[in-house]
């Protein structure tokens, strides 16, 4: 595995920290767009990159939040035009946890 690929993945320790920090889907906790999914989609919890891996988003705590499969798909697919709104909420959430949180600092640099 090359250095960049490794830097963009959440390792087991980081995944655990994110899961422990968020206690489930950050969007379900605020009741965000809860009407269009099955119970199965709400129960499957993923770690979501805030800055996408395809954009060089690092696999670090400050670049990950938990989301159920439904909300993860909403954010990744952007089919309903909610990505910008979802990222704004995540920005506020992360800023409350990490002083000076800045998504521009979450990108891989050589």
Regions found by a protein language model. Give the residues of each.
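Short basic/aromatic active-site micro-motif
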Residues: 47-52
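Short cysteine-rich loop/turn motifs with clustered Cys
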Residues: 9-46, 68-70
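Polybasic, low-complexity binding patches
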Residues: 2, 6, 36-39, 54-65, ...
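Basic side chains
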Residues: 3-4, 15, 21, 53
């Amino acid at each position: 595995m090359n250095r960049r690929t490794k830097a963009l993945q959440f390792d087991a320790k980081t995944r655990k920290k994110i899961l422990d920090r968020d206690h489930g889907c950050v969007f379900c906790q605020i009741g965000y767009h809860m009407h269009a999914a099955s119970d199965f989609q709400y129960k499957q919890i993923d770690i979501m990159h805030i800055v996408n891996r395809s954009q060089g988003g690092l696999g670090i705590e400050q670049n990950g939040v938990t989301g159920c499969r439904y909300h993860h798909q909403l954010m990744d697919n952007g089919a309903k035009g909610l990505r910008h709104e979802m990222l704004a909420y995540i920005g506020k959430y992360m800023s409350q946890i990490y002083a000076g949180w800045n998504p521009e600092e979450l990108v891989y640099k050589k």
